[in-house]
Amino acid sequence: MSDYKSTLNLPETGFPMRGDLAKREPGMLARWTDDDLYGIIRAAKKGKKTFILHDGPPYANGSIHIGHSVNKILKDIIVKSKGLSGYDSPYVPGWDCHGLPIELKVEQEYGKPGEKFTAAEFRAKCREYAATQVDGQRKDFIRLGVLGDWSHPYLTMDFKTEANIIRALGKIIGNGHLHKGAKPVHWCVDCRSALAEAEVEYYDKTSPSIDVAFQAVDQDALKAKFAVSNVNGPISLVIWTTTPWTLPANRAISIAPDFDYALVQIDGQAVILAKDLVESVMQRIGVTDYTILGTVKGAELELLRFTHPFMGFDVPAILGDHVTLDAGTGAVHTAPGHGPDDYVIGQKYGLETANPVGPDGTYLPGTYPTLDGVNVFKANDIVVALLQEKGALLHVEKMQHSYPCCWRHKTPIIFRATPQWFVSMDQKGLRAQSLKEIKGVQWIPDWGQARIESMVANRPDWCISRQRTWGVPMSLFVHKDTEELHPRTLELMEEVAKRVEVDGIQAWWDLDAKEILGDEADQYVKVPDTLDVWFDSGSTHFSVVDVRPEFAGHAADMYLEGSDQHRGWFMSSLMISTAMKGKAPYRQVLTHGFTVDGQGRKMSKSIGNTVSPQDVMNKLGADILRLWVASTDYTGEMAVSDEILKRAADSYRRIRNTARFLLANLNGFDPAKDMVKPEEMVVLDRWAVGCAKAAQEDILKAYEAYDFHEVVQRLMRFCSVEMGSFYLDIIKDRQYTAKADSVARRSCQTALYHIAEALVRWMAPILSFTADEVWGYLPGEREKYVFTGEWYEGLFGLADSEAMNDAFWDELLKVRGEVNKVIEQARADKKVGGSLEAAVTLYAEPELAAKLTALGDELRFVLLTSGATVADYHDAPADAQQSEVLKGLKVALSKAEGEKCPRCWHYTQDVGKVAEHAEICGRCVSNVAGDGEKRKFA
């Protein structure tokens, strides 16, 4: 028997079947670095329209976690897809390098500044620590396949950036947005510093809930207000609070002007309460026998005075909109030094902003004899005992409630009035302008707009000063007596900024005021405060984007971060940009959800459900991680687990196998010589290229909309359904058995070439390593890297006016599906082995029959059977299978007649008819020794 294997065009490629990504990717990365791939892309894209995604700086502390990976991969997908869409899209990664977490790490190792090290040495240690953290994180980000200017990232601790942060503050001062005030701010007693809103988390805490009576100073005036004469015992206004420790700072009692307040007689005294809360208060304090003596509107009680239970002074009743009937008594204990609402109303009434608490959370000397030096959280019991002793405590109970805590220490924080610097939301219209700017930004998903609008509408002034060592100095001089800013503040700040640009922030602390103030130095003091780190990162639109040459003066198009950044980086950037320039720093803002485990639980080391990106890359490869990110809807929580990653690896294999099939069957194809013109191609091949064209339209639209899970779904559908289960299956016969250089085969290879050129580009933003690998095996002259090019423009499709148009092939797909069902049943019944052992008769209604007949003898190639005939629907025998999908089709199957050709495996009756090739069929003889078969349709 002759060996005809050598006459077949069997697939062949060096592109490996297995990805082995974990082993192969590092080598590719090394090549990208050695070649300076990022630089090559920049050179290729020079002069094109720009798209700038400005990197929100991660904090330079600790290893990267799965959330970091999601963030950087999403950014990289966008930057690469924009490059393929014809944009110059430079990506400059950055790091946030100042602030408390780094100080704490350095403190743990070396002690606090001033103990073993000077503050200057401490800052140097912080700078050193941040630099090592940046290096560690950078390696992991690069390993993810993220392309960017990793050799020249921006760091908020770069001297030039530090100088520009000072300049940003100068512009804000110049525009009139800064003010100073003793104002209650979130204060962590462990950090001994004010905290930004974004540094506050809420946890459940148990506190004492107390009802306290403040006795009226003028009892008769109150009787007159309520129009009563007989009252048994003293009259008191009752407040309710869960922070007894703040009572020493009480300076008023707030009531609502429009609520009805009742004078209620209880045993031996009368109490004033909001009328709607009388019943619940009586239940709480355990009183069943009470009488309402009279009611008045809250407004009637304004400025009546009540005696503080133990501080020895009296306080006024004042009117406030913040009073509610949700809980309590309808009268709110008001301590302007310990709460933002209290502060605002205190300003209105000219109350003292008293703060009897030191930075360490203990009462200052002279507060009250039994409280001086006591930690405020240990003082609650002392205050309760004091109230009991004075007969002012009506009720106490334990209550669990949500309480603000320090994000770093997880310990409860306090509101504490301290002298701080603020960016005012309203004194120069910053709030109104910011709300206007928000409307001009595209928020993705669109609910982000309402979220940030409500935050801006309701936020307090931004406290930008911190009492820290490792941070950008505010660089201000204030007058010793008046505490006013120096009249030449902007000039002086520029002078400081120039020095910082040369020597870093230490230049401020080393600066002798005389050097720039001359004789005035004795009248002014240097402000020791540093800037909130959110000011550092929030000013990068100015300190980085406006100054980096690759951005060439273009504003950022996009900011992309996790959904917690509405109150973090998106907010601080909006505030600073609007305060400086009157406009938002971004055109689009995209947010992604947090990662959760397969059961939807938050990632937590204590539960042990974290997924380490390093482990995933070492086991499965970065492309699997990238595919998981792209295939997950980032607008909600993003679930990840070993099982979910395994599914991503399965999807990856399907895409890789498709790419490998294309490459293997392009063996021996030179596009410069072997390409067949579209009009001369086999119709099915043109249909396949048309499928790729339709897929490309969908995929590009999805990339444009940042809808990456749609990109992956469409890519999978193309690979698995349109190619894998239909086209690639059908063409194997023609591809392997036709004459190597025949139009029948070259037409097929032309289609595969166009499809491969398109597919490799669709993959590139997501499966960057694999796309680079595929690119290296594609035939024809090309640039060295897929990333320097643009989407493939060589695709074409069938015209709707053609008889065998897309709709024709869609129907053929359905027919083939119905035939497959019949073949599967016959295999199950052991009537046939493979589909080529079958011959089918398609009994069809006239319209469908005409379409099927048009394919002539080539119908069998579409159906993968050895025989296929078309007959009238009404002639179908009883055992013909009625199609459920196509009502006008029945399918009958019989065993194919003739012998099996060992070369093409088809069963035909002409095997052995040619003496010289006695073992093969006539079609194979033609392909081996003759002119080769002609194919027109399939």
Curated annotation (Swiss-Prot):
Q: Which GO terms describe its molecular function?
A: aminoacyl-tRNA deacylase activity; ATP binding; isoleucine-tRNA ligase activity; tRNA binding; zinc ion binding
Where is it mostly found? cytoplasm
Which annotated residues bind L-isoleucyl-5'-AMP? Answer: 561
- According to the UniProt record, list the residues that bear N6-acetyllysine: 183
Q: According to the UniProt entry, what is the EC number of this protein?
A: 6.1.1.5
Q: Where in the cell is it found?
A: Cytoplasm
The entry marks the following residues as binding Zn(2+), namely 901, 904, 921, 924
List all disulphide bridges recorded for this chain.
none
Question: Which residues are listed for ATP binding in this entry?
Answer: 605
Question: Which residue numbers does the motif 'KMSKS' region cover?
Answer: 602-606
The family annotation for this protein states:
Belongs to the class-I aminoacyl-tRNA synthetase family. IleS type 1 subfamily.
What is the protein name for this chain? Isoleucine--tRNA ligase
**Species per Swiss-Prot/TrEMBL record:** Shigella boydii serotype 4 (strain Sb227)
**Lineage of the organism:** Bacteria, Pseudomonadati, Pseudomonadota, Gammaproteobacteria, Enterobacterales
